[in-house]
């Protein structure tokens, strides 16, 4: 079953999400690069998003949602995901945060507007990225920020090794990462959707301060606004 023609929901079982969660814990507690990524997003939004609501789309295990809620407050930050099992799990673990299940009518029926929406390691899973991004733009307020983070892989799928092995055991012979983004290819899709990059950060696995292309990069984070809402951004302090 597909959600809004964008992703195959059967891939993202609770066990799959727990594999992702284990990687996040390893990247936060041992390698530290995941913590750097989360901190960078939080710091940028603290300086640029004002006091408006924040929605974490593709929240998975809820780690970023919870991290942001500690910075902004649980009444400000919400999470959303296509996996109902993950949403139910997150609601029990983080009971002060609102979590929404993304069903086939979510983007048409969800009435709230957000000062910022985060889309962390989601776009590479989406079959039709441009229509997907256009749906998300509708949820932004007039000056809203869309944060997009995508893996920086040497070979497509090398940062989703365990997820791909898990899928092989399930008889799914499809790379969970449908494309490998560079800055230019990501910018092309964002531009087609009506978004303009305001600021970007390469998240390096070994060097927090690095912001250049490298074989040791883990992710590329871009901070965007709809084309009608352009203004000079304030770079984060860390």
PLM regions and their residue ranges:
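Conserved class I S-adenosyl-L-methionine
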Residues: 147-168
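A short glycine-rich, Lys/Arg-flanked "PGG" loop and its adjoining helix->strand segment in the class I
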Residues: 131-142
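Serine-hydrolase catalytic-loop signature spanning alpha/beta hydrolases and amidase-signature enzymes
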Residues: 128
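Conserved N-terminal segment of class I S-adenosyl-L-methionine
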Residues: 1-111, 116, 120, 133, ...
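Acceptor-substrate binding/catalytic loop of class I
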Residues: 169-185
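Short, motif-level signal for alpha-helix interfacial/capping segments enriched in acidic residues
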Residues: 59-60, 160-162, 192
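Short catalytic micro-motifs in class I SAM-dependent methyltransferases
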Residues: 121-125
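A SAM-dependent methyltransferase catalytic signature shared across enzymes that methylate proteins
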Residues: 184-202
């Amino acid at each position: 079953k597909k959600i809004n023609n964008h992703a195959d929901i059967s891939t993202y079982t609770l066990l799959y999400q727990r594999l992702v969660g284990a990687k996040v814990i390893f990247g936060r507690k041992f390698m530290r690069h995941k913590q750097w990524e989360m901190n960078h997003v939080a710091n940028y939004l603290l300086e640029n998003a004002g006091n408006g609501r924040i929605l974490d789309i593709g929240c998975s295990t809820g780690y970023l949602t919870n991290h942001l809620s500690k910075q902004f407050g649980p009444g400000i930050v919400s999470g959303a995901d296509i996996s109902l099992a993950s949403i139910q799990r997150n609601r029990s673990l983080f009971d002060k945060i609102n979590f929404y299940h993304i069903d086939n009518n979510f983007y048409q029926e969800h009435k709230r507007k957000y000062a910022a929406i985060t889309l962390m390691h989601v776009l590479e899973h989406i079959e039709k990225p441009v229509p997907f991004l256009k749906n998300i733009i509708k949820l932004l307020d007039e000056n809203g920020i869309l944060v997009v983070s995508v893996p920086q892989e040497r070979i497509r799928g090398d940062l989703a090794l365990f997820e791909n092995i898990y899928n092989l055991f399930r008889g799914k012979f499809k790379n969970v990462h449908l494309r490998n983004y560079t800055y230019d290819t990501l910018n092309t899709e964002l531009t087609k959707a009506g978004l303009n990059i305001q600021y970007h950060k390469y998240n390096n696995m070994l060097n927090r301060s690095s912001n250049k292309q490298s074989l040791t990069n883990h992710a590329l984070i871009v901070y965007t606004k709809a084309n009608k809402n352009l203004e000079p951004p304030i770079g984060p302090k860390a």
